[in-house]
């Protein structure tokens, strides 16, 4: 399997439930230079990207200093990542996507960049315009029922009404939060 998937089993097994989309994400990253993971906040995009692409530097564009650098000097910012990176919350620096296009055109290795973002419309507009044909898009939603069953263990399935009350967001299950107080 490609070197872009250096899965840290310890971290993956203890801190993250196996997501059903992992095989799809691996396949997309082996075919496209950019993979964009979209979905609602707290659905597990960052955890998935960081746990699957452990050999890539991670940059959160939520961080004000990182975002300022990316916005003020996009070429300088991207020059640090000639071998690729994970850019989390890419919608916070949407112009960066245009600069990524030229980098990917010069060096189109599969799985080079992983982008994550929560604002579907804004992000998809940028990606579809600047990275058309260069990026695969994966929509990550909160847990499926099957994923929550794996988390609970096969003997501890919640009934449907309990499951609906608890919800499907990973943080609730991961940290065993009270769902009525967590959201």
Residue ranges of predicted features:
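Phosphate-binding site recognition
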Residues: 1-183
């Amino acid at each position: 399997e490609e070197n872009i998937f250096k899965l840290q089993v310890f971290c993956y097994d203890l801190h993250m439930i196996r997501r059903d989309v992992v095989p799809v994400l691996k396949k997309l990253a082996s075919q496209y230079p950019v993979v964009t993971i979209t979905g609602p906040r707290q659905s597990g995009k960052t955890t998935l990207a960081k746990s699957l692409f452990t050999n890539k530097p991670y940059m959160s564009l939520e961080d004000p200093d990182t975002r300022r650098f990316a916005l003020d000097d996009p070429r300088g910012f991207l020059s640090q990542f000639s071998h690729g990176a994970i850019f989390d919350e890419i919608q916070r620096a949407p112009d960066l996507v245009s600069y990524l296009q030229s980098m990917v055109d010069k060096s189109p290795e599969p799985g080079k960049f992983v982008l994550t973002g929560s604002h579907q419309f804004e992000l998809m507009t940028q990606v579809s315009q600047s990275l058309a044909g260069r990026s695969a898009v994966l929509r990550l939603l909160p847990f499926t029922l099957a994923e929550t069953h794996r988390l609970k263990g096969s003997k501890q399935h919640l009934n449907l009404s309990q499951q609906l009350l608890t919800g499907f967001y990973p943080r609730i299950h991961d940290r065993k939060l009270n769902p009525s107080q967590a959201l």
